[in-house]
Amino acid sequence: MRDIVFVSPQLYLSSQEGWKSDSAKSGFIPILKNDLQRFQDSLKHIVDARNSLSETLLNSNDDGSIHNSDQNTGLNKDKEASIADNNSANKCATSSSRYQELKQFLPISLDQQIHTVSLQGVSSSFSRGQIESLLDHCLNLALTETQSNSALKVEAWSSFSSFLDTQDIFIRFSKVDEDEAFVNTLNYCKALFAFIRKLHEDFKIELHLDLNTKEYVEDRTGTIPSVKPEKASEFYSVFKNIEDQTDERNSKKEQLDDSSTQYKVDTNTLSDLPSDALDQLCKDIIEFRTKVVSIEKEKKMKSTYEESRRQRHQMQKVFDQIRKNHSGAKGSANTEEEDTNMEDEDEEDDTEDDLALEKRKEERDLEESNRRYEDMLHQLHSNTEPKIKSIRADIMSAENYEEHLEKNRSLYLKELLHLANDVHYDHHRSFKEQEERRDEEDRAKNGNAKELAPIQLSDGKAISAGKAAAITLPEGTVKSENYNADKNVSESSEHVKIKFDFKKAIDHSVESSSEDEGYRESELPPTKPSERSAAEDRLPFTADELNIRLTNLKESRYVDELVREFLGVYEDELVEYILENIRVNQSKQALLNELRETFDEDGETIADRLWSRKEFRLGT
């Protein structure tokens, strides 16, 4: 009973004292004392949500009272303000569910095609609600500035994104009896966007009209309305507010994504495990969960990219259909003209033929231009966009490099210690330093070979000092040769150096080396053949004898230790492969060729060590 405590969730949620007790009470539930913190954490988010809801209600009540007071003080408005209020009311009444998918947005009549425009350069991070709010404000401002009380409104809109930072917004206005209101609205919006682009470089929105819509507007355009700077500043401030909200939402989303990877393992659920294994187990759990979250993010990005590509394909089909219809209408018109002109004179026929050829040439040029455009578009989607995404990912990774390195430090150390089995990994980094140190010891002990002067023998032959020291001669001969050598050295100081012929120098060096070898062989004691090591290329053993020796070598686990020394881990398959290679080929060179593919330069060291084992020596 000492490990049990009684708690009341109702009292805890109402922030009352006495919500926990050591004795049983009515309405209290028993839990372990170790689970008390978990109980508080599970109910904490409920309390936080309730507090945030209360604050929201208080703020909304305050805003409502302020709004009512503003309405009471602003009853008297001029004609311009009343028009804006009426248009705002109309927009609010129709602002819901105006977005349509791209395939549903396709215009089915000429009126719908004329009343359809597009906005280019809108940020891809804008939500549908933010886009509708921006469109409503722009339309209200245009109707107010053009002094129009028309019922013009946004009937539907759609969007098309090429998976870059911007998207295209297609807008279809409702058809009204007053064509002047529609024309003036488009002219004012176009002038407004152009005016803001001159003042602010970050504003990229531009109004684009189709050819039919452009001709329709130009035929009915009277005086182009002027844009007031204060109205342009007002619209730009609305645009910046929406952009700031988008940035804040994106930052919150990034924080949420980061929090999804910042996972903490509850050690209370792992209480039955030894404490020395908890740290590594927690790291493995966090690593696994982070990997799963990353995979889910990649799947989501891939699905988004597939949806964008499907939209592009659908839009391309729509454009192809419109192009075919337009080409068919041109072809039928050309056919009728040719039939009519068949009855004219020969000169007129020749002129018409030239005109048809010119039209066909223009059509071919148009098709070629469209083909180049499609190729460039394909190049953009297949090469440019993936490169941009990859560069952005590299930039983000480089910006957070130290944080990522510190977070995964234990994983990188583990990989460095246990998984460093790359074929190009250098396992003997200090080999050069060891060789240099041994060379210095040899020079200190025996002297520098380059500085030793050649010694002149009695017969006139030159021999190096190192070879002369290794030769053992009778006492009298040594004395006479030393006397001759001293004499020659003294005489050489008085005469210039003689340049020997190249061939004679080679002959002398060969003779001196042969004499040196003869003296050394005479001094070395004879060795028994049974004690010589089988260091030749091929092993002089029968198959049965070789199998016995390989079995002894395998039981000694010498090959296993060699593999572990150069790879860092035990590899049973590699050990079996090495032994099988020796059994089949019985050749050191064949084994060396195979080991170089795995151990690179260390393969020669491994082969030398194996061939120097007692199992491969004769007489053992």
UniProtKB/Swiss-Prot annotation:
Keywords: Coiled coil, Cytoplasm, mRNA processing, mRNA splicing, Nucleus, Phosphoprotein, Ribonucleoprotein, RNA-binding, Spliceosome. GO terms for molecular function: RNA binding. One of its GO terms (biological process) is mRNA 5'-splice site recognition. Residues 59-75, 258-270 have a biased composition (Polar residues). Residues 335-355 have a biased composition (Acidic residues). The keyword Transcription does not apply. The modification Phosphoserine is found at residues 512, 514. The keyword RNA-binding applies. It holds the Pfam family SNU71_N. Component of the 18S U1 snRNP particle, a subcomplex of the spliceosome. This is U1 small nuclear ribonucleoprotein component SNU71. It comes from Saccharomyces cerevisiae (strain ATCC 204508 / S288c).
